[in-house]
Amino acid sequence: AMAAYQSVKCLGYSDDQIIPFLAKLSPPPGRMQQLENSHIWIDYAHTPDALDNALSTLKTHYPEFKIRVLFGCGGDRDKGKRQIMGKIASETADSIILTNDNPRSEDPQSIVNDILAGTKVENDVQVILDRGDAIKSAVRTLGEEEALLVAGKGHETTQVIGSRTLQFSDIEVALNALN
C-alpha cells in the first residue's frame, strides 16, 4: 500500500484523492493473504528471506499470540536453504509443522530431515508429510491466541509429487478445514 501511495503521490495526486482508494487495495492472492474471520495467513514464502519476513510480520501483527508455521521445501531444488529455513522457523515461530511442498522426484522425508537439521531440539515440531492433512490438522487445532502461517505455495493450485502434477490449493484446503 505504501508503494502504491508513493507512486501516485509522485504523480501529483493529493492525500484526499489517494487515501480513500488505499482501503480498497489487497495483496495479490497468496501473498500474506488472511483467510476471512481467522488468524490464518497464506503466503508464497519459499525462500529463507521470505519466510523470515512473513513470520516477523505475524509476530508484529500478533504480539500476544503464539505463532505456528506450516511449510516444506521443494524437491530437486536448492538443498542449502532447507536447514536455514528450519533455523528461521525455530527462532521465530512457537510451533512448526513440516510437510510436503513440491517434492518432485525427491523423497519427502529426506527433504523434511534436511529442514529438521536446522531446528532446535526444544522446538515444538510436528511432521505431517501429506500437505492436505497437515493444513487440516493445523487449522482444526489452532488455539484462540494462535496465528497460523501456511507458507510455500501461496497462490499455486497444483502440487508436483514424483512425475504427477496434482490439483492442490493451500487456500482451498484451509478454507474447507475452517468450515
Model-found features: residue ranges?
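ATP-dependent carboxylate-amine ligase
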Residues: 3-179
